[in-house]
């Protein structure tokens, strides 16, 4: 059984708890855990380059005493492998009755500011120094590595990767190129009902292989600039599969170098630098917006300088469809919002779907519009005087970086975007570059996503019903480029193309556009 008064350096003189072993483990050491269930006073902190290795995946179980706190705090070069994470087994249900809100099985050590704010908690056993993690004396970041583990902690987060808790500032200044804020993973099963499989925030990054999420609230979540590459993975049951939400804080700033005409997809930016004043090259995964002065444009009556991106309308939510008989299915009401007030604006178009009972069930967005001002009203109006209440969802308009040139000694770089800039931009206009929350995945498997987090009700033979729209959610500027297969074998390439194997058909927005482009009047006449 071991004893925490033992030296811990020999198997016959082993420590009893992982926390005690972690307190003496130095860089390069491996904590070997023999089979058993270990109830630990957590968080357990690890020094740089310390490994924790269980005897086998099904033989070693970690049970945290503090269910609202992280289990392991890892740093540069740490390895966690061959472990189970679980709630106490005294509920007769394998520990699933115990909730673990905000508990990360593996996380970076929080900063003092986060601890003071009560957002996260400092390690109480093992290496208890406060975060953030850094690259250590090596001067080179090596991502913590999680391999061959299973998370059974209900409501928990398997990998909680907060970029604010990791940087490359070991010597007093950030070592460029090492500021990766990253973890890597191979084979980490998330059977944490109503939890999150992997959470990435604040410009964190991860490379994830063989992540299997089961009955989670969100399988993989990227927010505030978190990004990941996801390979050979699966999301089964639960509420949401993959979700990218929002953009991060400002990374780079600069000024437009020369007057640039409308409909250009590249622009020269001078003095392009990060928050510490160092000239930087913009990169794929960032989005830019211009702090234009509205007085420079003749097609808007608005004034002032923009400090946030302009917007488009992503969708219209039906809060209340109205009373029976309010609307006519044969003549649906008009749905409108105030016109966008930015330069080169486009008015959105919507189509209401009305049930036989005369209530609004949903709204189709025919055109998202363009260049709504950040502080503009998005009140949704419905003609006909019924009682429906609708609400607009918006996304920021960012010009995403395709390529950029190396900055000169004055920070001058030319950025080419994936989109065209619809309006002119004058020299001297300030710009901001922000990290996009993004999940990139190929061949992802979805099964019954949207059926809920109770596995006893979400499976199909208990009546579980999947919601296809919940497989991938990209909102508020987030992106999820993906290919996937669902429980029916239907193959999707992003949001625009579906290969339906049940009906042997191809459908989707992008397919329809391609067909329309090919079926010219001449082709139709020849046929």
Regions found by a protein language model. Give the residues of each.
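Right-handed parallel beta-helix/beta-solenoid
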Residues: 1-20, 37, 55-56, 508
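Short, T/G/N/S-enriched strand-turn elements that build extracellular solenoid repeat scaffolds
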Residues: 18-26, 39-47, 52, 70-74, ...
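Extracellular beta-strand-rich solenoid/capping regions of secreted or surface-exposed proteins
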Residues: 19, 23-27, 39-53, 60-82, ...
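All-beta strand scaffolds that present successive hydrophobic residues in beta-strands
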Residues: 33, 51-54, 79-82, 116, ...
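Feature marks extracellular polysaccharide-active and adherence modules
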Residues: 34, 41, 47, 53-55, ...
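Conserved, function-critical positions that sit in or immediately flank catalytic
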Residues: 255-446, 450, 454-456, 467-469
